[in-house]
A protein has these predicted regions:
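Short terminal alpha-helical segments
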Residues: 1-28, 81-88
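Acidic-enriched, low-complexity/disordered segments with a strong bias for Aspartate over Glutamate
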Residues: 3-5, 12, 32, 40, ...
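Amphipathic coiled-coil alpha-helices
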Residues: 10, 36, 40, 47, ...
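Amphipathic alpha-helical interaction modules
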Residues: 20-62
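Amphipathic alpha-helical binding modules
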Residues: 53-91
């Protein structure tokens, strides 16, 4: 699996989790990045890195559903988020 394949796979899984938590806005942002990663790696790298800075960033996201924090999903999402950061940085 190439880095781009892995990035696409990670983005798919992150989108699935986000949609389950009714976070369509975030899912759509990640889907847009997935669409560009094969065609414009420079822009994809910039978009991935920009997810991680400032207030309200992807780093600040905590997953809840029906008012209950999703511990397992947050753990999985955190692993995916960290892996995406490192792969994006290497693009």
């Amino acid at each position: 699996m190439t880095n781009i394949d892995e990035i696409e796979s990670i983005l798919d899984e992150m989108c699935r989790i986000l949609k389950e938590c009714n976070l369509e806005r975030w899912a759509n942002i990640l889907l847009d990045i997935k669409k560009m990663v094969r065609h414009d790696t420079k822009e994809a790298r910039y978009s991935i890195m920009s997810l991680y800075g400032g207030m309200g960033s992807l780093n600040d996201l905590v997953l809840f559903k029906d008012g209950v924090m999703l511990v397992e999903e947050n753990d999985v999402f955190d692993e995916l988020r960290n892996r995406l950061y490192h792969l994006g940085k290497a693009l």
